[in-house]
């Protein structure tokens, strides 16, 4: 009798995706992050579901319902902190996953890459709305500041902001709709992730060399299932260390104060994973310009396939672009640091220089270095 996993209509799909999938024999641990992101999403959906059972999306009770979860619900504190710090793990994996894609030229799989960029936007939107739900000071003011940015859109801006708010300020209507969106979006993300995988399996995985690996494939199971399990264990070790020993390390103390529209916190800043984009937003003195730069800082990823000038796909054998890549990584760390600093000298000028370098490296220097490397290797006639 033929193996059921190869004949059953449903098991057959799973088999071709996770068991008998032909994978390159040389993919490194940088290829673990796709599966880690899947696990992160599952953890977030499960913990989120249990939190939603006890949470109330009303301005009067939201803050105290989160307190109730932490104090009175069995292991509520664990679920809450796993969800909050799970978001941080999600973004760490996301940034490493995108960074891997940039380094090894995975963006040449256009469909997979574009769905990935869409996923990044969806996850960022979900995380932003989730941060509003506990209705602390930073929740309220973060929501006010970020939604207010839409008022920079000419002509329709103000109307659009009031439409999103459901009134003339961030209030009960805003919180209720943010909860609804925060609940539904992860399921949309899960659906998009399946499409992401679908497109990936049309072409097969990339590998560190960027060369065609059809001549040397191995089955996904057991080789990469075991490798992924190791990655998952390491990730859970990091997550649970964070949750059980340093649950508030990545949070903001201001969010332990209930939202008060009459009192502005001294420094309004988002969660750490948005700080690089926030720094770019703040470094431009013009409101609309800042908003455009903010959106472009992520949307620039969609341009990567068109900015690829080299005859080689990966950066493995391209030392000049490698140097630029690591400068870009350092630059993003500087932007993340600046995003959390007050708007005063010398942070303003550092932020502006880092923002200029961010766009310059991606749009100008990397394409030029690709051409230079090809010339040096005499890949052009």
From Swiss-Prot:
A ubiquinone binds at residue 201. Heme 1 (or BL or b562) is low-potential and absorbs at about 562 nm, and heme 2 (or BH or b566) is high-potential and absorbs at about 566 nm. Keywords: Electron transport, Heme, Iron, Membrane, Metal-binding, Mitochondrion, Mitochondrion inner membrane, Respiratory chain, Transmembrane, Transmembrane helix, Transport, Ubiquinone. This is Cytochrome b. The chain crosses the membrane at residues 33-53, 77-98, 113-133, 178-198, 226-246, 288-308, 320-340, 347-367. It is a multi-pass membrane protein. Its cofactor is heme b. It is found in: Mitochondrion inner membrane. Binds 2 heme b groups non-covalently. GO terms for cellular component: mitochondrial inner membrane; respiratory chain complex III. InterPro entries: Cyt_b/b6_C, Cyt_b/b6_C_sf, Cyt_b/b6_N, Cytb/b6-like_sf, Cytochrome_b, Cytochrome_b_C_euk/bac, Cytochrome_b_N_euk/bac, Di-haem_cyt_TM. It comes from the Eukaryota. Heme b b566 binds at residues 97, 196. The gene is Mt-Cyb. Belongs to the cytochrome b family.
């Amino acid at each position: 009798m033929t193996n059921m996993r190869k004949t059953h209509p449903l098991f057959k799909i799973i088999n071709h995706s996770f068991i008998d999938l032909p994978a390159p024999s040389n993919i490194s641990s940088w290829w673990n992050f796709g599966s880690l992101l899947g696990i992160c999403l599952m953890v977030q959906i499960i913990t989120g579901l249990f939190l939603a059972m006890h949470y109330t999306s009303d301005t009067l009770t939201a803050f105290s319902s989160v307190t109730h979860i932490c104090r009175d619900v069995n292991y509520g504190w664990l679920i809450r902190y796993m969800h909050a710090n799970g978001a941080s793990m999600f973004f760490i994996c996301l940034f490493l996953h995108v960074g891997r894609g940039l380094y090894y030229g995975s963006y040449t799989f256009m469909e997979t890459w574009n769905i990935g960029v869409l996923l990044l936007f969806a996850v960022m939107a979900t995380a932003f709305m989730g941060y509003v739900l506990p209705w602390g000071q930073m929740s309220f003011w973060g929501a006010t500041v970020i939604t207010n940015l839409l008022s920079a859109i000419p002509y329709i801006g103000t109307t659009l902001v009031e439409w999103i708010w459901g009134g003339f300020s961030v209030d009960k209507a805003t919180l209720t709709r943010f909860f609804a969106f925060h609940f539904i979006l992860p399921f949309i993300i899960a659906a998009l992730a399946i499409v992401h995988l679908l497109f990936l399996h049309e072409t097969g995985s990339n590998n560190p060399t960027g060369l065609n690996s059809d001549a040397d494939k191995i089955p996904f199971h057991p080789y990469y299932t075991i490798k992924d399990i190791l990655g998952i264990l390491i990730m859970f070790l990091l997550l649970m260390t964070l949750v059980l020993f340093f649950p508030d390390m990545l949070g903001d103390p201001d969010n332990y104060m209930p939202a008060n529209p009459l009192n502005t916190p001294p420094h309004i800043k988002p969660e750490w994973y948005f700080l690089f984009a926030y720094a770019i937003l703040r470094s431009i003195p013009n409101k609309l310009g800042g908003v455009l730069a903010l959106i472009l800082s992520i949307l620039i990823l969609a341009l990567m396939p068109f900015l690829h000038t080299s005859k080689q796909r990966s950066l493995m054998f391209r030392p000049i672009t490698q140097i630029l890549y690591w400068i870009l990584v350092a630059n993003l760390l500087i932007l993340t640091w600046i995003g959390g600093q007050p708007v005063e000298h010398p942070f303003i000028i550092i932020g502006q220089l880092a923002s200029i370098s961010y766009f310059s490296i991606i749009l100008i220097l990397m394409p030029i270095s690709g051409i230079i490397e090809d010339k040096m290797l005499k890949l052009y006639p």
